[in-house]
Amino acid sequence: VGSWLEGGPSGEGDHGAGLGLAPSGPGSAAPLGRRALALVLDWTLSLLLASAFFSSSEGPFWERADPMVTLAVFAVENLLLVGTLGFTVGHRVLGLRVRRAGATPDGPLPDDGRAPGLGRAAVRTVLLCLVIPAVVWDSDGRGLHDRSAGTAIVRR
C-alpha cells in the first residue's frame, strides 16, 4: 500500500524505460505527486523571497509579492540550482534530482550523476515558466520542458 507520493497504480512503472531509467528506486522516473509537491514548495519559497525582499506593501506574504517578481525569483532559483546542483529546494526535500536524459546512437545516455548544466537548465526553466509545456507529457512521463532540455526528474 503506497501513498500518492509514491506514484500511480501498477502498470505505470514503465515510465522512463525508453530513457534507460531504473524501473523503481533511485534513478527511476519521479512520480507525479512528488514532482507536483516539489513545484509547490519551490513556488512557495519564491513567493516568500519575493514578498520579503521586493515588496513595499503590508499584508500576508501571498498578497504582497508581485506575480512577475515571484516568477522571476522562481526562474532564477530553477536556473541556478538545477544548472549547478541538479535539483531545486523542493526536489531536494522530496528526494528528487534532475539528470541528463536522452538517446544516443548507442542507446540511452548514461547517468553520470552531474548536474544538467546551465544551458539545459535555461531551456527547461523558460519552458517551465510558460506552464503549458510542463503539463504535457510524453510516454516516459516527462513534461515537454524536460524533453526539450534533454532532462528527466528521477528519484535520488
Where are these regions (language model features)?
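Membrane-interfacial and juxtamembrane segments of integral membrane proteins
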Residues: 1-156
